[in-house]
Structures are given as C-alpha cells and as structure tokens.
Amino acid sequence: MRYEKIEALRQALHRCPERSDQEYQTIEKLQLFLRENTTLELHSKTGWFYALHREAHAPQTIAVRADMDAIENSHGQLFHGCGHDGHSAILAGLGLALEGKTLGKNVCLVFQPGEETGTGGKRVSRELFQELRPDFMLGCHNIPGKPLGTVLLRKNTFACASLGLSLTVTGRQSHTAYPEQGENPVFLLSEIVLALPNLIHHITHGDPERLLMATVVQMKVGERNFGVSAGTGTLALTLRAYRQEDMETLERAILNMAQTGCERAGMTWQSSRQDVFPDTVNRPVCCVRVADILREHHLPTQVLSEPMRWSEDFGWYLQEVPGMYLGLGAGEDHCGLHTYGYEFPDALLEPAINVLETLVRAL
C-alpha cells in the first residue's frame, strides 16, 4: 500500500482544523479520498458518516471508529493538538488496506465528530446502532511518551469519566459597609471548595484504585466594586474519576451542599453540566482476546499500570457493544497532547493501520 497517500491526507486534514460538531471540510476531504481510492459504501449522516466494507452473507460486523475534531489554543486558534487528523487518516488508510480483500465479515469505519466535548460519541453511537449493530468495536488514541507503534492495553477502565459542573448561587447584594444586610454567596462557594477533599475521601476511603478528583477551573463572585458586597457567584469544577459511579456520587454530594447551604441562608441556586464523558471501560474478556491476537502476530504491546486521566467518549459505544479501546505509542520524546508543539507523527500511520487491519481480520 502507498502510505504516502495516507501521509498526504493526514497533512491536508492538519491544515484545516475544525471545531467539534463543525467538521464540514474534514468530512469532505475524507469522503473524497475514500471515493477516489476505495469502493467502500459511504453513508452520510448529519455531521458524520461511516464507510462500509460489505460482504454478502457475512456472519459478523466489526466497527472501527476515529474522531475528527480539533482543539483551541489559549489564543482561541484551532489546531490539531490531539492528533485527530492522524486518527482519521489511519481509519481512511484502513479502508484502503481492506480494498478488494475478502474478509468473511463486514467492516464499518465510523468517522465521528465532537469527541473533545463528549457530544459526538453519545449521538453517533445512538444513531449508528439503530442502523447497524456491530459484533465488536475498536477505537484508539495516539499516546506521546510511549514507544512508537507500541499497542497500549488495559482491562477495565482505560480512560476516566469526567464532567464539567457549574454552580450559580444568588443571594442578596448589599453595601460593603453593611454586609450583614445582604447574603454574599462567597462563603457558601468557599465552603464547598474547602469540603472537596473530605467529600472525596468519604467516597473512596483513600483507595488508590478509585481515583476521584475535583478541580476548580473558575470561581467568580461579584465585580471589582469596592462599595458592593456581591449578591451572585459562580463556581465551575471539573470532576474526574476512574469509576463513573464515584464521580456521580461526588456530584450529588456537592449539589446537596449547595441545596442545604442556600436553604440555610435564604439564597437560590442552579447547576448545569457540560463536557460529560463516561468512563471508557474495556471488558476483561475483550482485552484478553485482543492481547492474544497481537501476541500471535508478534506486535509490540505494553500493559498500562493505571487508567489515563483524560476522558474519551468512546465509552458510550462500549456501554452498548463488546469492544476495545487501545493506545498507540506516538514516540517516547514526542510532545504531549494539547501542547503547542504537538503534531501527529506520520511515522505512526503505517504501524497503526497494520495493528487495526490485523485485529479486524482476526476478531
């Protein structure tokens, strides 16, 4: 196979980074590549598509998914700092590798939007499974800091559950000379922040196998007005856990504190969730099956000692069908994900396509 075609595609995708759920040019480029180089069936949906290698009377279907969206840097500029250009190019390359071959199965290549916000996997899994329910589903992510091309495996939790939790508390504004005449939300919001370590310990009992985190990303109360004691305040937290149920327990505890504190002080509150990701969990039986195939084909593997702390919306698929989420080493000295210096390494394209083709054939 001519891997220079895949490299050229990856570089073309790199030059047109697009926001989550707005991957219009990316989809056009990918579909054009597949039309020109394969005979795969293309099924266009709203904001996403899948390409199908169909065989008559095939007894099973294997699905492989890639994400397409870019991220923003601190200046609001879009760039492919997570390597989704590479993931999409790998999946298109897999389509090219399978062209004209008889596999004894159908293979569905899913090009998914909106991974960075967690919206894409939830929507696409629901829409895809209404039409086509795979017997096994694969996903992967490049991992800087690990040997190039090494397949990274982990049973049970591979990537953390996470969500963004926002609280808005409304009290009563007053003159700073008479703060007792008002209700400033700063005290309740501070009480919640200071209680977080104890809440976490109460849930996990200090078990290192039950990582649970709450990171304050923003706290804002009032304005820089030295004559006004604030009447409104907001607190934004990122909750993250190895186990989704632990994260949801912590969320309930925080909301209970907000409810109780507001009732006590005569204030009101509201909350919202953003960027909700489930935990990405590999069933042990699926992990053993994949590991056996990789070992039989003498492909390099490494077992991760702990889950990735970041989140990945492939977990939505794994809640519904058997499957496996893999890491692919991007190089031990490669720049980290979401950093300014990061770019997907083209040297990973060939080994990644080989890994996926091997698994698709053997599963």
What are these regions (language model features)?
Residues 65, 139, 232:
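Structural signature of FAD isoalloxazine-binding scaffolds in flavoprotein oxidoreductases
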Residues 1-81, 86-103, 108:
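Acidic/His- and Gly-rich active-site-bordering loop/insert found
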Residues 49-52, 70-81, 85-86, 101-218, ...:
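Histidine/acidic-residue-rich, glycine-tolerant segments that coordinate divalent metal ions
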Residues 1-17, 100-101, 125, 167-172, ...:
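N-terminal hydrophobic/helix-forming segments and targeting peptides
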Residues 95-102, 130-131, 318-320:
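Alpha-helix C-terminal capping segments
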